[in-house]
Curated annotation (Swiss-Prot):
Residues 1219-1232 have a biased composition (Basic residues). It holds the Pfam family Herpes_U30. Coiled coil: none annotated. This is Inner tegument protein. Plays an essential role in cytoplasmic secondary envelopment during viral egress. Interacts with the capsid via the large tegument protein/LTP and participates in its transport to the host trans-Golgi network (TGN) where secondary envelopment occurs. Modulates tegumentation and capsid accumulation at the viral assembly complex. It is found in: Virion tegument; Host cytoplasm; Host nucleus; Host Golgi apparatus, Host trans-Golgi network. Residues 1-10, 1115-1126, 1181-1190 have a biased composition (Low complexity). Keywords: Host cytoplasm, Host Golgi apparatus, Host nucleus, Virion, Virion tegument. Residues 1127-1136 have a biased composition (Acidic residues). Belongs to the herpesviridae inner tegument protein family. Residues 1-20, 672-708, 1090-1239 are annotated as: Disordered.
């Protein structure tokens, strides 16, 4: 038998849970004929020879060869003395046509017509005309098949969308199922035949809204309904693209001036990685710019140079809710925290409208599906029309599923209604994916019935996972009010996305099989028919029609008949004969004993019970176990008297045999399945098929729905059900015997169940276990890599940065040697008396900030995708196995077993679920880290456009213009104190960021940039008796402050001490770092620094000293900024609390004293006084060592003063030489970088 199921060399390879691919019956009719000739008089051997035709299929081309058909029928004629072969021979036309298949794509309708001619010639002359009373008459079946072939040819040629309707015995033919599937395939390929009403197009208020609908409809070639505005022409599409680019786009360049949200196209505010670079928004922009380039005669720009499609508050208000599923670029941006300056109130109003519209769409889907619980092509078309009209097809659903899987779930809680909208998108896209994957092959066939059932169960598992994720995930308090505000319940209980899929569930054709079974003369043939039915349709067979016992003659004649039967074979002799039989070895039955009325009970008690015990105990090898089961089914079946008990016992034994064979050797292929072609295509009407013209796209490889005819998902459960049925029959037989009191209790071993379950799911468990281990290892690696990056980001933003406005240099505080060596120094203030700084330029700092966020977000996106893939793998591989294992554990058969079987898949499921919890936790931790929003939030002000430019600054100083009304809200002050305050950056962190994020950070920058060239813009002559005044500005100044300084220095020679605005900031609130002051005060402050102001740094070490002694200086200085000015608490995230400030000390008197002194008027002596008046704890030295003093001109006194006034910093070369190697695991590991190959 195993050799009959050899794999086809041309077959593909399955997945991790796939068994070897199976060909059709090797050799077809020729091999079956040879096996029949070798079987002789052994009924078990005959059963083994015919089993491939009973349960499998063979190529239709074999029936077109008269020699093969003749040899097969002649072999059956030699065995016509036995009931089983005689029944096959009597209905050979039905028997052969039932298993014939088009699955080898070289077969077509020409081969079918030739096969029908051969079968017609094989019929006896007496049955040349159809018999009206025999549904299995050969002539009648051939005539019906010819009519079906003609109808199929007409349907395919006309292409009218009509489908083939079949009833009667021909519905059980394998090739007829394939013809039906082909007509349905042609119908779905042409769908939709009628135009779709894109109501979002007519309701759109903007050109962008109409453009999105037009691109969707034209890309997918959907027909437009005649009503409404009609289908846009090519000229209309080009005109829309031109309008979007030239009139509302603000220029396709997306330059710096558009960051405020004025244009339709923007550069992403921060994202530059592959996964997290807003791919949907970029694709939308590519579509618009591509048509625009075609309309304007230009070339389409490369994708890397194209900005993303963005939005502003005005455009967001104009987006109609009816097009909710067309705004994927908006949802994508919001989930990645890209708002383009749109207020939260506008975003929440938009999301509320979209959530309400999507819930209405879900209700329309439910209404279209109705309450139908079985296959309904009309309902399928209605649901498809609703989804396609709303803008949701398989591609769009896949994009939404990928987007939602790649974004951390905690991102959904930032705005009210975002969680509700994302939940509805998730359920709608998941339903649409299942729906449109089932749609192309939907047909009332056995293969699709298995696929649809598997998809339905998978959808149920996904719904359970979604509910579990919502209940166990992070709380979203904003989602609950959002759900109840206008009656939208998506956040709490999204719509039922599983029940509508019932319109794909195909009911089995039980009536047709009943009609066939009623006309079969062999009980064995009838039982095997129902085994085939159970396997094809994964449905339980109805209870067998029990034969009636031969009636005894009445009165004295009946007693004589009974006496004669008992005398011919007494009960004891029959029992002794049954005891002497050897299961699987005794070939011929003795009619004298088999005809006895005592034979059924004795055979059940002395053969079926002990033989089945040996099979279930796994004491026999595989071949002997199968042989024993075949023998129990076939022994004496042709000779024994009709017996209800024996018939009831042999039906489940046949099912056990077929299922065990299925698990051991793999099931033979079923209708519609082929190792060469997955999926169905219309057949070649001329008889020349196209081999392999369909790829694996859309193929289902799960739960017995794949192309290789794998064992069904509940194979072990079916065996247990059959054993339980046999148990009941054995118990009845034993209880009716005379030895009922002496019989041992009925108990079954479980070794075979354990073995079969292991064979069924060992590959699945091993694959999933390996995938889980790899997932955990990759998570550990990612944690080690990304933790160093997030830690460096945390330390970078935990200390104020020093900025030199003159040179554009930034000084990053570094940890002292004591801080690097003492780990416990973090819990208390441990600041060395000689702080170190690392110098870099402002552009490099911006690149570092951007790179940190990009790497963190890319890692979060890729890890979220990996977690989603692992969850999908669990649903696909483990959930079906769990269903069966739980059914096994709760099976009532264990009441009659010695040791209940407890499959260990629950432990594997716990490990996988624990791994997924860790994956979700890591994704949430990345999302809450400060690095995730490093550019968008912490250092956002670095990337904002300047408040004023140099020209306007000069005009303000010259009193030619009023100060602009630009006031930046003051950020929250960093929390002071705390045990978790991180130390400053170390040089290891600097080198790490330089190697992995921005190489320019560690480049040698010993030279200073040359002084910018100045250009005179106005000269006053002595004609008015005034001294000439040279007013110069810098064409490309490092900052606006430099322009202020240079212009004011030549304007004013006297100063009035002034420090703050007329309305100082409230106590406890940090004023804005760039404060717009009146021109007089600004000029006075700038000139108060003296003529050497241009040589002095405009910013000093403004780290918050003890208690606010320098608070006035910090609050009033318009030149300095620190990372505290850029950071804020991440609302609702709970992850930004790791930003800490540097608390200080001091008294109120010092504060009052400093209020009357300009912020930048200072001397080295006062700086030294301040330093000594505020001693720092845990500092072993009060003066820096000579090697750590600031370099520069001046005498010893000035150098010593400068050493106190300006903190020293290291150059890149010096920093590299002072780094000590680290041996911590993963210290030199680079974090994941975004690459083009990332998925």
């Amino acid at each position: 038998m195993a050799s009959a199921m050899e794999s086809d060399s041309s077959g593909g390879s399955g997945g991790a849970d796939a068994q070897p691919p199976l060909a059709e019956v090797d050799g077809g009719l020729a091999r079956v004929t040879r096996q029949l000739l070798l079987s002789g008089d052994d009924p078990a051997a005959r059963l083994r020879a015919l089993m491939p035709l009973e349960l499998g299929i063979f190529g239709l081309g074999d029936l077109a060869q008269p020699v093969l058909v003749r040899d097969f029928l002649n072999t059956l004629t030699l065995m016509s003395g036995h009931a089983y072969p005689a029944a096959v021979l009597r209905h050979h036309a039905y028997y052969l046509l039932r298993a014939a298949s088009f699955s080898r794509r070289s077969f077509g309708l020409g081969h079918l017509e030739a096969a029908l001619d051969v079968l017609a010639s094989s019929l006896p002359p007496t049955t040349a005309s159809p018999a009206t009373d025999d549904p299995l008459d050969g002539s009648r079946l051939i005539a019906e098949t010819r009519a079906l072939a003609a109808a199929y040819r007409r349907i395919i040629e006309e292409g009218s969308g009509e489908v083939l309707a079949v009833s009667g015995p021909t519905a059980t033919f394998a090739f007829v199922e394939e013809l039906v599937a082909d007509t349905y395939l042609a119908r779905w390929d042409a769908f939709p035949r009628e135009g779709l009403s894109f109501y979002a197009f007519n309701a759109a208020k903007t050109t962008l809204g109409r453009w999105l609908v037009t691109v969707y409809a034209e890309t997918n070639r959907y027909p437009w309904a005649a009503a409404g505005q009609g289908q846009p022409t090519a000229a209309d599409i080009k005109a829309m693209a031109v309008e979007l680019v030239e009139h509302s786009g603000g220029g396709a360049g997306g330059g710096e001036g558009e960051e405020s949200g004025g244009g339709l196209f923007h550069r992403p505010e921060s994202l530059s990685s592959v996964v997290a670079s807003l791919p949907l928004a970029r694709r939308r922009a590519v579509e618009i710019l591509g048509v625009y380039a075609e309309a304007s005669g230009g070339q389409t720009p490369p994708v890397a140079a194209v900005p993303v499609l963005a939005f502003d508050a005005a455009r967001l208000r104009l987006l109609e809710p009816s097009g909710a599923l067309f705004y994927d670029y908006v949802y994508e941006a919001l989930l990645w925290d890209q708002t383009y300056g749109v207020p939260d109130s506008v975003i929440e109003a938009f999301l509320a409208g979209m959530a309400a519209e999507m819930e209405a769409l879900a209700a329309r889907v439910q209404e279209a599906a109705g309450s139908r619980a079985s296959f309904s092509p009309a309902a399928i078309e209605q649901v498809a029309t609703v989804l396609l009209s709303a803008g949701l097809n398989e591609t769009v659903a896949g994009d939404y599923a990928m987007m939602l899987a790649s974004v951390p779930r905690v991102s959904r809680s930032r705005w009210r209604w975002l969680e509700a909208t994302a939940a509805l998108l998730e359920s709608l896209s998941g339903f649409a994916l299942h729906f449109f994957r089932l749609l192309p092959t939907a047909s009332p066939t056995s293969r699709f019935a298995r696929v649809a059932r598997a998809a339905y169960l998978r959808a149920e598992a996904e719904a359970v996972d979604r509910r579990a994720r919502r209940t166990s995930g992070p709380s979203t308090p904003a989602a609950a009010p959002a759900a109840t505000a206008v009656g939208v319940g998506a956040a709490a209980d999204p719509w039922d996305a599983v029940t509508p899929l019932r319109i794909f569930i195909v009911p089995p054709p039980a009536a047709e099989y009943e009609q066939v079974a009623g006309d079969l003369s062999s009980e064995l043939l009838r039982s095997l028919l129902w085994v085939r039915y159970s396997r094809l349709w994964q449905a339980p067979a109805p209870a067998p029609a029990l034969p009636c016992k031969p009636p005894l003659l009445p009165g004295e004649q009946g007693r004589r008949q009974w006496t004669a039967a008992v005398a011919a074979a007494p009960r004891t002799d029959v029992e002794a004969y049954c005891r002497s039989l050897r299961a699987g070895q005794t070939a011929r039955a003795d009619p004298a004993y088999v005809h006895s009325p005592f034979f059924p009970a004795a055979f059940i008690e002395f053969q079926i019970w002990p033989a089945l015990r040996r099979v279930l105990s796994n004491e026999l090898p595989k071949t002997r176990s199968l042989a024993a089961l075949r023998w129990l089914v076939s022994f004496g079946s042709d000779l024994a008297l009709p017996s209800p008990e024996l018939t009831r016992a042999r039906r489940p034994l046949e099912l056990i045999y077929a299922t065990v064979w299925e698990i051991y050797d793999g099931a033979p292929p079923m209708p519609g399945e082929s190792p060469q072609a997955v999926g169905l295509r219309p057949l070649n009407l001329e008889g020349e098929g196209k081999a392999g013209d369909a790829g694996a796209e859309g193929a289902e490889d799960e739960e017995g729905g794949g192309p290789w005819g794998l064992s069904s998902h509940d194979a072990v459960l079916r065996i247990m059900d059959a054993v339980r049925e046999v148990s009941g029959i054995i118990s009845e037989t034993i209880s009716a015997s005379e030895r009922a009191a002496e019989a041992p209790p009925l108990a079954w071993p479980t070794s075979l169940f354990s073995l079969l379950f292991t064979l069924r799911y060992s590959t699945t468990a091993e694959s999933l276990g390996l995938a889980t281990r790899r997932f955990l290892v990759s998570g550990e690696t990612l944690s080690e890599d990304i933790s160093r990056l997030t830690g460096a980001a945390w330390r970078l933003c935990s200390r104020p940065l020093l900025y030199d406005a003159e040179t554009g240099r930034v000084q990053i505080p570094l940890a002292t040697e004591e801080e690097e060596e003492a780990v416990v120094a973090v819990k208390e203030k441990s600041v060395s008396s000689s702080p170190r700084h690392y110098s870099t330029d402002l552009q490099t700092l911006k690149s570092v900030v951007e790179g940190i966020q990009d790497v963190c977000r890319d890692a979060a996106a890729r890890w979220a995708l990996a977690t989603a893939d692992t969850a999908t793998l669990r649903r696909r591989l483990l959930v079906p196995a769990l269903r069966e294992s739980r059914g096994i554990a709760d099976h009532p058969l264990w009441a009659h077993t010695s040791e209940p079987l407890r499959p260990d898949l629950e432990e594997l499921n716990e490990r996988v679920e624990h791994a997924l919890e860790l994956g979700y936790s890591l994704t949430g931790a990345l999302r809450r880290s400060v690095a995730y929003r490093f550019r968008d939030y912490t250092f956002a002000r670095l990337f904002q456009p300047p408040a004023i430019d140099a020209e306007r600054a000069e005009a303000i100083v010259r009193r030619d213009a009023r100060p602009p009304p630009v006031f930046i809200p003051a950020p929250r002050r960093l929390p002071q104190g705390g045990a978790d305050t991180p130390p400053p950056l170390s040089m290891d962190d600097i080198l790490y960021l330089g190697k992995s994020i921005c190489k320019a950070l560690v480049d040698v920058l010993d030279h200073h940039p040359a002084a910018p060239e100045t250009t005179p813009i106005k000269t006053y002559t002595p004609a008015m008796d005034l001294n000439p005044e040279q007013i110069t500005v810098t064409p490309r100044s490092p900052s606006v402050l430099a322009a202020f300084a240079r212009t004011a220095r030549v304007q004013t020679h006297h100063l009035v001490p002034a420090l703050t605005d007329d309305s100082p900031s409230p106590v406890g609130q940090t004023p804005p770092p760039f404060r717009i002051l009146p021109a007089k005060k600004l000029a006075a402050i700038l000139l108060g620094n003296g003529r050497n102001a241009s040589k002095r740094r405009a910013s000093r070490d403004l780290s918050p000293p003890p208690h606010g002694r320098w608070r006035a200086v910090l609050d009033s200085s318009p030149f300095s900024f620190s990372s505290s000015d850029f950071s804020d608490q991440d609302e609702g995230e709970g992850g930004e609390a790791d930003l800490r400030g540097v608390p200080g000390g001091g008294g109120e008197g010092a504060y009052e004293e400093d209020r009357e002194r300009p912020s930048d008027i200072d001397t080295a002596a006062r700086a030294q006084k301040v330093e000594t008046s505020c001693p720092r704890r845990r500092s072993p030295r009060t003066t820096p060592s000579p090697s750590r003093r600031a370099s520069g001109g001046g005498g010893p006194d000035r150098g010593e003063a400068e050493a106190h006034t300006y903190p020293p910093y290291l150059s890149a070369a010096a920093a590299a030489s002072r780094v000590r190697p680290r041996t911590r695991r993963g210290a030199t590991r680079r974090p994941p970088r975004p690459t083009a190959e990332d998925e």
